[in-house]
Regions:
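N-terminal strand-loop-strand
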Residues: 1-34, 61
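The catalytic Nudix box helix
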Residues: 34-35, 39-68, 78
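Active-site-adjacent beta-strand/loop module that shapes the phosphate/pyrophosphate-binding cleft
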Residues: 74-104, 137
Length: 154
């Protein structure tokens, strides 16, 4: 079994929209993920999130408040077949863009990432977002409406 993995995620909201990675899982539909990824040995969460945003957005961010902690125990969810031995703990932080998003400066897009997109918060539930439960954790103005620990949700 794999060790438990720490992952950091960016919540970037501006003008009633949230910035998410646009992804193609080869299933015929567009999906969206929060920018971020795994913490490396010797990195703080803040350092990891700044690195991940540079890799995936080509942008520098400032990292603010920790607002959610989510567990993902793969065997409990829809991707159990491929993620059965995965246990990841994700830490979601409010972030602000310090530079503009520029994918030509992105250094390491995720394999399934085909771009980024600003999605209207008032229509967030209309999109395929992973984890979908996170769309339920904020209102249409981006205000956090859930406790910090959201559990093993997808």
């Amino acid at each position: 079994m794999k060790p438990i993995r720490n992952s950091v995620k960016a919540i970037i909201i501006e003008n009633g929209k949230i910035l998410l990675n646009k992804c193609d899982f080869q299933d015929g539909k567009t999906s969206y993920l929060f920018s971020g990824g795994g913490q490396e040995v010797g990195e703080t969460f803040v350092e990891a999130l700044k690195r991940e945003c540079l890799e995936e957005l080509g942008a520098q961010v400032s990292v603010g408040e920790l607002v959610w902690v989510r567990e993902y125990i793969g065997k409990n969810h829809q991707f159990a077949e491929s993620d059965s031995d995965m246990h990841q703990i994700e830490y979601y932080f409010i972030c602000k863009l310090e530079t503009t998003v520029d994918l030509s400066k992105a250094t390491n897009l995720d394999a399934v990432q085909v771009g980024v997109e600003w999605l209207d918060l008032s229509r967030l539930k209309e999109y395929t977002i992973y984890p979908a439960a996170m769309a339920e954790c904020m209102d249409e103005n981006g205000k956090i409406t859930s406790p910090i620990y959201v559990g093993d949700v997808n």
